[in-house]
Amino acid sequence: HRQEVCHGDCNQHNIIFTREGIGFMNFDYWHCGPQTEDLCLFMRKILEKHNWDPELGRRMAEQYNRKRSLSVEEWKHLKLCLSYPWRYWKLVNYYASSQKVWISRKNIEKIEQATALWQPWQRFLQSFC
C-alpha cells in the first residue's frame, strides 16, 4: 500500500466548504498510511446513516476514483476496511475499558442500532466491488 498522509478522522464534521474549495480541519489523528483508510471511514460514517445503501456506496467510491484512481490493491484494502465490524469493536472496547459491571441504556441502544444495520451492511458488502 502507498504510504501517504491520512487525516485519521475523515468524516462530514471535519470537512469545510469555502469559496476557494473544499478542505479539512482537525488533524489531531493524522498519520502516514494508505488513504483508503480515510475513504473507508468517510464512507462508513455516511453509509451507516443511509442504511448501507449499495448504490450510494458505489457512487461515493466511483467519484473518489475519478479524482484519485485506486489500484486493484487499494480496492481490496477498501473492501477489507469496510468489512471490519468497527461499530461493534468500538462498543465492546468502550465497555471493556470502562470497568463497569452494567451497560447503560444509551449503550444498549447503540448495540441495538448496530444490530439493526447488520443485514443491510452484509448486503452492501456482497454488492461492493
Q: What is the predicted role of each segment?
A:
Residues 9-11, 27, 69-70, 113-117, ...:
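Short flexible/disordered coil segments
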Residues 24-25, 59, 81-84, 113-116:
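Alpha-helical structural elements
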Residues 89-129:
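ATP/Mg2+ or Mg2+-diphosphate-binding catalytic cores
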Residues 11-14, 26, 51, 65, ...:
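Detector for Asparagine
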Residues 73-74:
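Conserved ATP-binding subdomain of kinase catalytic cores across diverse folds
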Residues 36-69, 82-100:
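Active-site activation/catalytic loop segments of kinase-like enzymes and analogous catalytic loops
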Residues 1-37:
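Active-site acidic catalytic loop and adjacent metal/ATP-binding pocket
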